[in-house]
Amino acid sequence: RWLKNDIIRGNFQPDEKLRMSLLTSRYALGVGPLREALSQLVAERLVTVVNQKGYRVASMSEQELLDIFDARANMEAMLVSLAIARGGDEWEADVLAKAHLLSKLEACDASEKMLDEWDLRHQAFHTAIVAGCGSHYLLQMRERLFDLAARYRFIWLRRTVLSVEMLEDKHDQHQTLTATVLARDTARASELMRQHLLTPIPIIQQAMAGN
């Protein structure tokens, strides 16, 4: 888990070779457990095998960024439609509760703790909305896309949560989204969600270009 988090957070760079000697020292683990962890990360497309004996951090590209985020945005929009059609009173209450918790976190500092807490509440808010769809398999597919987007999202997360202006904009978006979902305006809620999930793209593109 620590290795996965370090890759997502950019502590290991794309295409960087993962030397077993460094990993055993860093995580105080034996070669066996590390190979298991690396095999799992290969399956998750965060690590690639080099010549069947070594490992590297998987590459990142603008093409992959656009593909993953487009897939996520369209998947989330569909799930919102289903959630509005199927969700009951308990679903509405959970969406409201998670929206409230997210809105309470307004502090803006550079600590990892702040980033983690905001992201946890942000994920919980979005998960509460789509949970109303009632489909275990669709939610599994959504989680898979979320994992694929994780490294790109963390680039966006650092730039967004550490900016008062951007954080306020996100707060406004979440308020509008919550109100529209609870009003059960399916068409508008779906489109708002789709656009909401696409907004990080320009920020990530700038960061990847070194701007």
Region annotations inferred by a language model:
Residues 62-66, 83-89, 109-114, 157-165:
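A ubiquitous short alpha-helical element
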Residues 36, 76, 122, 174, ...:
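Acidic active-site catalytic centers that drive phospho-/nucleotidyl reactions
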Residues 62, 73, 96, 168-172:
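Amphipathic alpha-helical repeat elements characteristic of tetratricopeptide repeat
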Residues 49, 122, 169-171:
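Short, flexible turn/loop "capping" segments at secondary-structure junctions
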Residues 1-85, 137, 205-211:
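Short linear motifs at protein or domain termini
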Residues 26, 161-211:
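C-terminal regulatory/effector modules of DNA-binding transcriptional regulators
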Residues 89-156, 173-180, 188-200:
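Conserved amphipathic alpha-helical segments that form helical-bundle/coiled-coil interaction surfaces
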